[in-house]
Swiss-Prot record:
GO CC annotations, alphabetized: plasma membrane; proton-transporting ATP synthase complex
Subunit field text: F-type ATPases have 2 components, F(1) - the catalytic core - and F(0) - the membrane proton channel. F(1) has five subunits: alpha(3), beta(3), gamma(1), delta(1), epsilon(1). F(0) has three main subunits: a(1), b(2) and c(10-14). The alpha and beta chains form an alternating ring which encloses part of the gamma chain. F(1) is attached to F(0) by a central stalk formed by the gamma and epsilon chains, while a peripheral stalk is formed by the delta and b chains.
NCBIfam families, per the entry: ATP_synt_delta, PRK05758.2-2
Species of provenance: Pseudomonas fluorescens (strain ATCC BAA-477 / NRRL B-23932 / Pf-5)
Localization (cell): Cell inner membrane
A GO MF label: proton-transporting ATP synthase activity, rotational mechanism
Alphabetical list of InterPro entries matching this protein: ATP_synth_OSCP/delta_N_sf, ATPase_OSCP/dsu
Main subcellular localisation: membrane
Known function: F(1)F(0) ATP synthase produces ATP from ADP in the presence of a proton or sodium gradient. F-type ATPases consist of two structural domains, F(1) containing the extramembraneous catalytic core and F(0) containing the membrane proton channel, linked together by a central stalk and a peripheral stalk. During catalysis, ATP synthesis in the catalytic domain of F(1) is coupled via a rotary mechanism of the central stalk subunits to proton translocation.
Protein name (record): ATP synthase subunit delta
Length: 178
C-alpha cells in the first residue's frame, strides 16, 4: 500500500496543482473519481493489464469508455499515466488528490461508527465539537455497528478515538493480562 501511494503521489500532486491553478478542483476530483471507478472494473483491469496493447491503445480505450466526461487536460493526464503504466494507480491517485483538496479547503472527512443510530442533532453536535478540536470543517459520515455495544469510534485521517464499550473492554482485558 505504501509503495502504491509513493508511486501515485507525483501524479496526484501534478493533477492537484493543475486543478488548483485553473480553479477546477471540483471537476478534477469528479473526473479522478470516475477514472478510479472505471480502472477498478474487471473488464477494464484486463485491458489495462494486457501486454499486447500499447500505452496509447490503453489510454484511448480508457478515454472512450469514459465518454465526454474528460476535458483535453484530463485526457492528456490519462495518456501520461498510461505511458508510465500507472492507470491501475488511479484509485490511489484519486484518493491522494481528494486529501490535497481537503487540506486546501481546510476540511476533513470524519467517519463516526456508533452502536446505535445518531439523530441529526447528535451528529451536528459531534461535528461542531470535532470541528473545534481539529480546526477544520468536518464532513461527518455516520454508520452503525451493534458490536460496539455502546459509545462511538471516530476516525479522521490517521486520528482514531475509540470511545466504544467494546474498545474499553478490550483495554481492560489487556490490562488484566499484564
Amino acid at each position: 500500500m505504501a509503495e502504491l501511494t509513493t508511486l501515485a503521489r507525483p501524479y496526484a500532486k501534478a493533477a492537484f496543482e493543475h486543478a488548483q491553478a485553473h480553479q477546477q478542483l471540483a471537476s478534477w476530483s469528479a473526473m479522478l473519481g470516475l477514472a478510479a471507478a472505471v480502472s477498478q472494473d474487471d473488464t477494464m483491469q484486463r485491458v489495462l493489464k494486457a501486454p499486447r496493447l500499447t500505452s496509447a491503445e490503453k489510454a484511448s480505450t480508457f478515454i472512450e469508455v469514459c465518454g465526454d466526461k474528460f476535458d483535453a487536460q484530463a485526457q492528456n493526464f490519462i495518456h501520461v499515466a498510461a505511458e508510465n503504466d500507472r492507470l491501475l494507480l488511479l484509485p490511489e491517485i484519486s484518493a491522494l488528490f481528494d486529501l490535497y483538496k481537503a487540506e486546501q479547503e481546510k476540511s476533513v472527512d470524519v467517519d463516526v461508527t456508533s452502536a446505535f443510530a445518531l439523530n441529526q442533532e447528535q451528529q451536528d453536535k459531534l461535528a461542531k465539537v470535532l470541528s473545534a478540536r481539529l480546526g477544520r470543517e468536518v464532513r461527518l459520515h455516520a454508520a452503525e455497528d451493534a458490536s460496539l455495544i455502546g459509545g462511538v469510534v471516530i476516525r479522521a485521517g490517521d486520528l482514531v478515538i475509540d470511545g466504544s464499550i467494546r474498545g474499553k473492554l478490550a483495554n481492560l482485558a489487556e490490562a488484566l493480562k499484564s
